[in-house]
Amino acid sequence: LGNICRSPLAEGILRSKLPSNFVVDSAGTGHWHIGNPPDARSIKIAKEKGIDISNLKGRQFSKQDFSDFDYIYVMDNQNYKDVIALASHENEKAKVKLILNELFPNENVDVPDPYYGLQDGFNNVYNMLDEACNVIKEKLLKNKPR
């Protein structure tokens, strides 16, 4: 929702797995944390895994993102509804996918929001996102134009 917990982790994880010519970004559907760094607990687990997300800043998803990105992964069903509501046509809607559907096709499983929990919740979210990003990486590298 606010682009400080799950989505910066996903951005950092996916960016670490892809060549530098891929553009990876994250955004929240809410405006609460625009310009803020990721939650300290997200930064901590990412750092433990060798990924630095401390320089990321929260931003809000915008209609322009449909033009700027080929794939838009969301963390939960509410984010999905919020992003789909901004889409102007079916081509834009087709870009939006729940990230855990990469692991559990058509299950529409949410990545739990760890914000109100303890560090363990962030660790679990990291592991889920890492697995999903491995699948995404393989798909992107397989489909990349030569």
Feature-to-residue mapping (PLM):
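Short beta-strand scaffold positions
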Residues: 74-75
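Conserved active-site segments centered on acidic
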Residues: 1-68, 138-146
